[in-house]
Structure formats: C-alpha cells, structure tokens
C-alpha cells in the first residue's frame, strides 16, 4: 500500500482593477468573457469546457501539454451574490489522479471608480501531487490575466 497524505493550506490574493464590480463579476459569470482570461499556457491543448453559472451549477475544463498529462478542473457554484461574491468548490485531477480539493471565495468591493477583488482559497492538496505555493502562483497569474482582459475591453463591453 502506498503512503497517502493531505496538506491543508489557505491563501488570499488581492487585486484592484480599473473596472466597476459589475464588469469584474461579468468576467467570471459570462462564459465568453471568462474564456478570455481563464485559460492555459499557449502550448497546451484543451477541451471546450462547460459552464453553468448558477448556485448548484457546474464548470469543467481540462487540458494539458500535447502528449499529456491531462489536467482537469471541475467546480460547483455554492453561493452567488450578484456583483459581490462567488463561492465555489472544485477539485483538480491529473489524468485519473485527484490532486486537490478546494473552497474558493471571490469577493468584490467598490474601490474608487474600480474594484478590489479578494480571493480566498482553502485547499486540501492530496498525496504530494500538488501544493499551495504552485496553486497560489497559478491563481495570481489568472487574476493578472483577468486584469489584462478588463483593461483591453471598453467599459461598455
């Protein structure tokens, strides 16, 4: 029998965007808008994914470098407050191996003419396949990509 392990970790990432909370919320809630920033490295291949943005709805996406392994994200939306909060649980797999299970909370606060986003993630990283440092770094990269997507679109988009 192999040795099993779980490592728990919590991290918080904050960003301020020059976009009002409704625009930032839309970037999470609308599949087309989310596809502009919630993405993978350029050299990866991925499926089209699915997104049902409502409490109890699911979102899935998978992909990886050509030739594998395949990384899969599967989430369930637990709580949604329009333009204020999104709470979801998700797990990550690498091929058929579950690597982590997480609870993520996104909070949006007005900040001048923009938005302060606070993302808190509580994760259980399983059997050494993933770690909090890598997840936090990936989250920061995604939130930076969100900022770039918001900055590249006109406010009415």
Identify the role of each PLM range.
Residues 1-45:
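Hydrophobic ligand-binding cavity/cleft-lining segments
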Residues 148-157:
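Short, highly charged C-terminal tails/helix-capping segments
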Residues 87-89, 93-141:
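Beta-strand/loop substructures that line and gate deep hydrophobic ligand-binding cavities in soluble
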Residues 21-22, 53-54, 78-85, 107-116:
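A short, structured loop/turn motif at beta-sheet edges
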Residues 58-82, 86-88:
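Helix-adjacent hinge/juxtasegments
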Residues 15, 49, 73-79, 102-109:
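Hydrophobic/aromatic beta-strand elements that line small-molecule binding cavities or substrate pockets
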Residues 12, 32-70, 157:
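Short beta-edge strand/loop motif at the mouth of beta-sheet-based domains
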Residues 24, 34, 59, 77, ...:
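Hydrophobic pocket/interface hotspot
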